[in-house]
């Protein structure tokens, strides 16, 4: 929904340095990955000297707090240097207003960081963060999707089966997560993967971008219809 990669990279570098005392020279791939996964890869890539067993795991919580603080310090930069993907704002609002629908996020970010990023662009009122799935929980995304479904069921008192859940994805990895976690996958070729790659991955439906709001909501309705 939002592209804030430049600010996120800056925050990662600041948090990594604060926790390890070493500069972040090599940054792992960020999109689609959990913050914990990125941190452990960064330790390996930057040859951080961790002699004690369990030292990397012990540093994860301080790193998560430092990353949240760094992002908060750069909140104004999120909108100055970042951007909403084309059509994202209208799409999020339209999905939230679909009758019988609850909208949340499944993200590699921690909950505080996800809230910060979306609220910076005015999207916080269209997403129920309470039932989301977050990278700070260190689950694979497929498992994290099941956790989010359970949270939604507990809060709303209804079961969200595989055919009643749509994961709007933008990578082959996310399409796999939808299959594992129990959801229909509506993939958007927003840059991380081509439409052909998303179809080959097995996406239930593919859109070129988020600009066709009516088309997006129509696909969600079709994918969750009893006969689909």
Could you say what each language-model-derived stretch is?
Residues 167-205:
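Acidic, Mg2+-coordinating phosphoryl-transfer loop and its flanking beta/alpha structural elements
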Residues 213-225:
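Short amphipathic alpha-helix with an adjacent loop that forms part of the alpha/beta core around
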Residues 104, 109-166, 172-181:
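Substrate-recognition "cap/lid" segment bordering the active-site pocket of phosphatases
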Residues 1-31, 43:
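Active-site neighborhood of HAD-like aspartate-dependent phosphohydrolases
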Residues 46-48, 53-73:
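Active-site phosphate-binding/coordination module
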Residues 133, 205-211:
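Short acidic-hydrophobic, aromatic-tinged amphipathic segments that line or gate anion-handling sites
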Residues 73-104:
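Short, acidic loop-to-helix structural element flanking the phosphoryl-transfer center
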Residues 37-54, 148-151:
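Helix-loop "lid/cap" segments that line or gate small-molecule binding pockets
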């Amino acid at each position: 929904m939002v592209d804030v990669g430049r600010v996120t990279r800056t925050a990662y570098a600041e948090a990594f340095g604060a926790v390890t005392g070493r500069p972040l020279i090599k940054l792992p791939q960020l999109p689609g990955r959990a913050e914990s996964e990125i941190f452990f890869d960064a330790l390996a890539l930057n040859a951080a000297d961790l002699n004690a067993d369990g030292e990397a795991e012990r540093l994860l919580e301080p790193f998560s707090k430092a990353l949240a603080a760094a992002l908060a310090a750069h909140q104004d930069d999120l909108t100055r240097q970042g951007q909403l993907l084309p059509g994202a704002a209208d799409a999020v609002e339209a999905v939230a207003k679909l009758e019988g629908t609850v909208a949340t996020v499944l993200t590699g970010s921690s909950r505080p960081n996800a809230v910060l990023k979306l609220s910076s662009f005015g999207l916080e009122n269209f997403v129920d963060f309470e039932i989301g799935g977050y990278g700070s929980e260190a689950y694979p995304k497929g498992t994290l999707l099941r956790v989010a479904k359970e949270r939604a069921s507990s809060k709303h008192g209804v079961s969200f089966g595989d055919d009643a859940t749509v994961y709007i994805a933008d990578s082959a990895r996310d399409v796999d997560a939808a299959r594992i976690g129990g959801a229909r996958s509506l993939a958007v070729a927003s840059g991380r993967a081509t439409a052909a790659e998303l179809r080959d991955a097995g996406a239930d439906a593919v859109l070129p971008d988020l600009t066709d709001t009516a088309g997006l909501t129509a696909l969600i309705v079709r994918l969750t219809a009893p006969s689909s």
